[in-house]
Amino acid sequence: MKKNLSIVILLISLAISQSVFSQTYSFEKGKVPEGWKIDKGVLHISSEKYKSGSRSLQIKWKQNAVLTIPSPTGISEACRNRNGGMNAWIYNESPTKENLLFSFRDETGKEVCQLPFLLDFKGWRCIWAKFQGDMNMSSKSNIQSVEIQFPQHTKKGVTYIDLLEFTSKVSWQNMSDAQYKVNRTDYSLIPDFIGYRNACLLYTSPSPRD
């Protein structure tokens, strides 16, 4: 009985400690997070597309637009942990052969790492990527802001973001796909790793709209 109680207390403590350092931006409050801004476009909380709940962040962007996210919740702890990084779901309306570029910057505005994400699809795609392990960020770096840079040659587009999180522990199931690359190469440890990962996604992911 005491052993079971200790396990329960430990699990609760872990959950609380994780919530202190990490927050999932699910956009269910119905308003754009404070300080988020785009220089060429419009940010809107929308119920048109969503991965969880009933809302997501709709971004109507124009050529060369930049969305700036200052001091995102959880980013400091994510930087300090070798497994820290970013999780997100992206919905793209019109496929293009250009990238959405996540640029991570320190207090001076210098880029410390980046993640190109190819927009050649329509629908939802996920991102699970580590700052140090996948984006080659130095362990001494500290991220203060995030820039999401939109295509340079495509005139305009609409993209949605949901369940954005800067976390101290990116899932071990992360792997490269058509949209972005990670440095993981040990998939052979699990037979049919891709089938296993996709099964986990189906089990753990909420039912999306579209």
Regions found by a protein language model. Name each.
Residues 1-8:
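Bacterial N-terminal signal peptides that target proteins for export
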Residues 8-17:
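Bacterial N-terminal signal peptides
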Residues 21-38, 173-199:
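Extracellular carbohydrate-recognition regions
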Residues 46-66:
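Short carbohydrate-recognition loop motifs
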Residues 61-137, 157:
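Extracellular ligand-binding interfaces
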Residues 146, 162-166:
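Extracellular beta-strand elements of beta-rich domains used
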Residues 148-155:
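Short beta-strand-plus-loop segments that form exposed binding edges in beta-rich domains
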Residues 203-210:
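Conserved small/polar residues in nucleotide/adenosyl-binding loops
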